[in-house]
Amino acid sequence: MAKIVDYGAFADRLKAAPNRWDVLREFHEEWGYAVRPGSDRWDRWTEDEHETYVRALSGEPRDEDGLEGVDLALPIPAALDEWWELPFNSFTHDSQHYETNPVYPPTVRPDPSGYGVAGPLQDDSDLVAPDADRRVCVFMAENQYCNEWGYLAAEAHDPDPRVLVSVDDDRWALQARSVSEFFLQLTVQRLPRTLGWSAEIYDGEEIIDGDEDDLRARITERMPELGFEPWAELQQDTIVYGGPDVLAFVADGELGGIAFAGRTPRAVLDLAERLGVKLTEEDLTEPGEY
């Protein structure tokens, strides 16, 4: 990791990138992830499941075919299938880093099978026209289904539609500008704190110059955001800020907090010093194995 990556310029990098898959591949490389030769791969469906789906599309009788909740009239966006096939995809090779469950093919909300917990897009949302289809097609969920992520059925024909997140059982919020950006954002949330050097900063600790509110203010003033929508999960909204080889995760809500993750221990310690946090290398969590 001799070359320093300035995540303070990440928002500009997003704007300049021709597509999100290039940035996703680079991000994997920057944090030291590589698919292990011969490792198992999570396929989006088995051969039998795919055959069942194709038969259902052709109009053959559907009797307990395992596709409850799937609207066969809706296409699956190209970006979702592309993500499953990415050769460098850390989710499909090491899903333990993510603590989420994929849903494939996507199922609609409200879910006619009764399995999905969220409802349709709320009536007062301006994310679609008043007379548009307000169903949401869910393709990913938090392990306990506390949050679900999906795209609007009204946008299912788009190759890379916007992604919404369920913030409670009857409300959805915008999570990402596209499916491909969602997966980049999910990786940013997961890999650095697993494969990098990290530290959780807790309010009330004497290591902070001032209190947590002072630290939040310094981060906001001195570090640029990465350019994503706030990450909504488990009743927290997390904004990620960038610096040289380092990220700061700032979450609000009842379970909110602050965390640093760096490609090197020096990057985390330098950030801590700039922000008035007293840390030593012994305070850092070392990168995990995969």
Where would I find each of the regions flagged by the language model?
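Short Lys/Arg-enriched alpha/beta "domain-start" segment
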Residues: 187, 192-233
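Short amphipathic beta-strand/extended segments with alternating polar/hydrophobic composition
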Residues: 149-153, 173-179, 270
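Hydrophobic beta-strand residues in large extracellular and virion-surface proteins
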Residues: 80-83, 163, 248, 258-260
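Signature of lipid phosphatidyltransferase scaffolds
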Residues: 170-197
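Extended, charged low-complexity segments
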Residues: 233-290
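A surface-exposed partner-binding patch
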Residues: 1-158, 193-202, 220, 225, ...
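Intrinsically disordered, low-complexity regulatory segments enriched in Ser/Thr/Pro
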Residues: 151-154, 158-167, 254-263
